[in-house]
């Protein structure tokens, strides 16, 4: 049986990346909450 998680960096960034987060109001809210928590990585695409 095929496993459910088939990693793809491109798909990951397109759904959870920085530019997608910035594109919506709720996405910007997520980033602001992560900045408030002083997260070193705001999104999966940031290194």
Curated annotation (Swiss-Prot):
Biological process annotations from GO: translation
Gene3D superfamilies: 1.10.287.3980
GO molecular-function term, one example from the UniProt record: structural constituent of ribosome
GO cellular component: ribonucleoprotein complex; ribosome
Keyword vocabulary terms for this entry: Ribonucleoprotein, Ribosomal protein
Ribosomal protein among keywords: yes
Entries under InterPro entries matching the protein: Ribosomal_bL34, Ribosomal_bL34_CS
Cross-referenced PANTHER family: LARGE RIBOSOMAL SUBUNIT PROTEIN BL34M, MITOCHONDRIAL RIBOSOMAL PROTEIN 34 FAMILY MEMBER
Similarity comment text for this entry: Belongs to the bacterial ribosomal protein bL34 family.
Protein name, UniProt field: Large ribosomal subunit protein bL34
Organism of derivation: Buchnera aphidicola subsp. Acyrthosiphon pisum (strain APS)
Name of the coding gene: rpmH
């Amino acid at each position: 049986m095929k496993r459910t998680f088939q990693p793809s960096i491109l798909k990951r960034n397109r759904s959870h990346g920085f530019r997608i987060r910035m594109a919506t109001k709720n996405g910007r809210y997520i980033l602001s909450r992560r900045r408030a928590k002083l997260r070193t990585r705001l999104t999966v695409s940031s290194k």
